Amino acid sequence: MSERTFNWKNKDIRAQVDVVDSKLLPTLLLRNALVLNPYVKQWLKKNIWIYQDRIVYVGHELPNRAEEIHTIDCEGKYIVPGYIEPHAHPFQIYNPQTLAEYVSQYGTTTFVNDNLFLLLQSGKKKALTILNELKKQPVQYFWWSRYDLQTEVLNEDHVLPFDVRKQWIEHPDVIQGGEMTGWPRLVDGDDLMLHCMQATKKQRKRIEGHFPGASDKTLTKMKLFGADCDHEAMTGDEVMRRLELGYYVSLRNSSIRPDVRKILQELHEKGFRYYDHFFYTTDGATPNFYKGGMTNELIRIALEEGVPAIDAYNMASFNIAKYYQMDDYLGVVGPGRLASLNILEDPLNPNPVTVLSKGTILRENGCDLKAFTKTDWHKGGLVPLELSYDMTMDDLQFSMPMGVKMRNAVIMEPYMIEIDNSMEQLSFDHDESYLTMLDRHGKWRVNTMIKGFASSVQGFVSSFTTTGDIVAIGKNKADMLLAFARMKEIGGGIVLAENGNILHEIPLALCGCASSEAYEDVLEKEQKLRDLLTERGYEFCDPIYTLLFLQSTHLPYIRITPRGIFDVMKKTVLFPSIMR
């Protein structure tokens, strides 16, 4: 990479060397641990000297005056590098701080994050302010730079002009480009996207793909364009196809694609047991998926499926750091590396008893030390949503002949509307509901029907969508208006109304798309929302992703976008949005 922000200054390095020479005392000593060494693939009994945020010595010696140093006795315990999530979407109604604060207790302390939310919600100048704010936290955040907005908007050149893309690509905290949700545009001749990819490569940074179901020929083309890794393999065969073409592969286990166990079983059935080009990712799962942690759960699955322990842990740390050319800084418990590591009671149990990140103890002997601080989101323009308009009955006029039918939680296909949808209350005898999408600025709307969402949801409104525009779904127009009014009143969020009452709400104070509340509170509210929707006929796995992907044109077949109802396969607007 062209520039790195985590280099220590000369005086810091001199002080670290002085610690090795016993001229200064370490700030933390870990004694008698069995340390995972990924270079020799062995557990080695060592003492670890840490000075502030850096590991300065790993070996058999103890420092002078060791009794004066804060010491953790690791006799009989194992030390592994802090876990890395290489593909995070950190605003899935939670936010990067609260997510990290929660999952770091389970050992994940480095996050490579999507910047799409910041591009759409924070503005060109303020978005990078958030990166600096998050550096104050005791975990490590890196980012990727989007080449497209993952939906059809009216002004993409304004939201994502080349100068903004270039600014992100060249930022030292940005370590990759992608993910390539807009790759069909690239194949069709989008030279601006190719130019951005070339700019990424000139910075010696990686490019993340997004190639679900891609053929060998498509994968080959993407390699020629510059893609390095893909997280969309869903079977053992798809993993092998990518490996054979020279890709690194992120094995995904997310709330909508929990594939890791199945993939490992299929690879092992083929006799394939070579893991050096594999990572894990949870690909931005929704809150309840992380109830028991993040990367630790994927390591557990790998261990249960017979992956050797050292390989299972390398896939969570060393392999990722090496891929991003950061193994001199992360992913190794060794001299010169950042002091981010996990202390385990047993290598077969990836839940750490003690967690260090950037030299700070986040968890000790099973206790959360509350090391995080509040992030000032206002500096980055992430404030409560202020709508300048109200939804009215005029916004709930439905005459379109075609609606969207849910095949699963995220795949939508067209269907012809046959019921009478001119009334204010629809019957509970079918699973068709009104669907309206409103511009957050009040300029346009899209009205259609959605089939398969639920049979008895009366009024459901969310400002959590890909673009932050407002979606309203329901059987009863009055309850839809009530839910909208409450969503507006609380500054954005997800609201469920029924029979003139508010049943449930999730306030989303960060532009109406992410919560500022503690992760545990968000998790509890999301679970209650799932339960209420399930009771009313929602049959799929993840309503949060249903809301997010209604607009997302990287998935087939039909999407509700700011431009109107969009045919993804034909790349055309079937029914344009209507000016209000």
UniProtKB/Swiss-Prot annotation:
Its EC number is 3.5.4.2. One of its GO terms (molecular function) is adenine deaminase activity. Signal peptide: none annotated. One of its GO terms (biological process) is adenine catabolic process. It catalyses: adenine + H2O + H(+) = hypoxanthine + NH4(+). CDD domains: AdeC. The modification Phosphoserine is found at residue 399. It is an enzyme of class 3 (hydrolase). Keywords: Hydrolase, Phosphoprotein. Belongs to the metallo-dependent hydrolases superfamily. Adenine deaminase family. This is Putative adenine deaminase YerA. The lineage of its organism: Bacteria, Bacillati, Bacillota, Bacilli, Bacillales.
